[in-house]
Regions:
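Intrinsically disordered, low-complexity segments enriched in polar/charged residues with Gly/Pro
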Residues: 64, 122-123, 191-195
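Extended amphipathic alpha-helical segments
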Residues: 111, 118, 122-129, 133
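N-terminal targeting signals for export/organelle localization
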Residues: 24, 128-198
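A non-transmembrane, solvent-exposed segment enriched in polar/low-complexity residues
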Residues: 1-120
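N-terminal "domain-start" segment that seeds a small globular fold
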Residues: 185-221
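Extracytoplasmic/periplasmic, Sec-exported soluble proteins
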Residues: 121-124, 162, 219
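Alpha/beta-hydrolase fold active-site loops
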Residues: 224-226
Length: 226
């Protein structure tokens, strides 16, 4: 949408560091990068991604492309701002355009009614995709499953009702597995941080700063409101 164009966007490429061959073909933003691999973990990740893209994502992409081709995504007011954004390089003018675009979005005047219906449908499809992915994560306690779980956890917000789902998935399926993997460390910290309550228990830990000096959490917050 407008935020992709005004704030910048990119197409990330995910693969595992493992023995095997990986071939990458990169394109501009208009086309998804191509990746092929005979390495087991990366191959399974690519297989799962293709399966879910074919089932959930590609039909949505085709529908969005149709709306874009027919000019039915942005309202006339938003189209004017997008044209202004493309033509100017002045930082103050760009900031002013972003503010106006945010205001249009806040007032529900940034997108057409047809596109709003599409957005609602997208949310429903993504919910089905997330359920399907959760089943895979639970049934396949591999590094691929842990990667998908970690990626989903990184996207969570504090108010997200699915946070408990991912916490339980980690606790019941992945605790004790892949102890030396950085994704395990991330999930341990993520789960612990989301369980911190005022007056409640917390996981104490020690970590260095940029100069290598060690600091312990319990010592740093002693006598303070944390």
């Amino acid at each position: 949408a407008w935020s992709d164009q005004m704030n910048g966007a990119w197409r990330p490429i995910s693969f595992f560091s493992e023995n095997g061959k990986i071939e990458l073909t990169l394109y501009s933003m208009e086309k998804e990068p191509e990746i092929h691999s005979d390495a087991p973990l990366t191959s399974e990740l690519l297989r799962f991604r293709k399966e879910t893209n074919d089932r959930f994502m590609f039909p949505l992409e085709k529908e969005r492309e149709r709306l874009e081709q027919e000019g039915k995504v942005e309202t006339p007011e938003m189209k004017v701002l997008l044209e202004q954004f493309k033509k100017t390089k002045d930082r103050q003018e760009l900031d002013a355009i972003r503010i106006k675009a945010h205001q249009l979005e806040k007032e529900g005047k940034a997108y057409t009614e047809e596109y709003k219906v599409f957005e609602q449908k997208s949310q429903e499809v993504y919910g089905k995709y997330r359920e399907y992915q959760n089943e895979y994560i639970q049934s396949n306690p591999t590094l691929v499953g842990l990667y998908l779980l970690t990626r989903q956890a990184r996207r969570m917000h504090d108010s997200d009702e699915n946070m408990t789902t991912y916490t339980n998935l980690y606790r019941t399926v992945y605790v004790g597995k892949f102890a030396d993997n950085p994704m395990t460390e991330y999930m341990e910290i993520w789960v612990a941080s989301n369980e911190i309550k005022i007056g409640g228990k917390f996981v104490d830990f020690t970590a260095p700063d940029l100069q290598g000096v060690q600091y312990t959490l319990s010592e740093e917050i002693q006598g303070k409101v944390a």
